[in-house]
């Protein structure tokens, strides 16, 4: 993970999918960044940043992080799912347990099989405007990646960073 907090997903990212130009997209992202900083300050949360420049507040869950980001998108005057979509870097290779096909989430202690983790990603993608998941499964979970691709590959960009770097 890139920050010490209670969120399992390593990084959440925004993409200005509705921006008419690159220049506008950069401006939009900057506006959301500042709206998120203000929102975190209002809630008494830290606005320190992680290793790659993103905020690292101590939030209770991945969903709380997503909801904060979407609230900041709205606060900046944009529409989630239309003007902005989300991406996540799960870095789930770090969750691999000693049992093949099992994931142990380090902060919550929850356990998932590959199938359960795929269902978790599917539910998040149905509930929120998520367009990309990076490292949604462990780099050695070949069968899981096939199932993840079947479940989400037509609607969500699946990025295999660790999968391709280490295989």
Indicate residue ranges for each PLM-predicted region:
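Fold-independent oxyanion-binding glycine-rich loops
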Residues: 1, 12, 16-17, 52, ...
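Mobile "lid/hinge" segments at catalytic clefts and subdomain interfaces of large enzymes
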Residues: 1-50
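Active-site-proximal beta-alpha loop/turn segments in soluble metabolic enzymes
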Residues: 11-22, 46-62, 94-108
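Generic preference for flexible, low-structure residues
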Residues: 25-28, 56, 85, 149
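Short acidic-aromatic active-site loops that bind/stabilize oxyanions
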Residues: 26, 59, 134-135
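Catalytic core of soluble alpha/beta enzymes
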Residues: 63-167
């Amino acid at each position: 993970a890139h920050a010490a907090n209670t969120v399992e997903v390593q990084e959440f990212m925004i993409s200005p999918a509705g921006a008419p130009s690159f220049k506008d997209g950069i401006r939009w992202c900057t506006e959301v960044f500042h709206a998120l900083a203000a929102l975190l300050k209002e809630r008494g949360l830290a606005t320190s940043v992680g290793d790659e420049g993103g905020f690292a507040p101590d939030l209770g869950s991945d969903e709380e992080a997503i909801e904060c980001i979407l609230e900041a998108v709205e606060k900046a005057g944009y529409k989630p799912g239309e003007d902005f979509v989300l991406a996540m870097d799960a870095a789930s290779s770090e969750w691999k347990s000693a049992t093949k096909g099992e994931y142990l989430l380090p902060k919550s202690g929850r356990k998932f099989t590959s199938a359960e983790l795929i269902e978790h990603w599917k539910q998040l993608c149905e509930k929120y405007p998520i367009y990309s998941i990076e490292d949604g499964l462990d780099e050695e979970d070949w069968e899981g990646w096939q199932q993840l691709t079947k479940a989400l590959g037509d609607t969500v960009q699946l990025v295999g960073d660790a999968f391709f770097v280490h295989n």
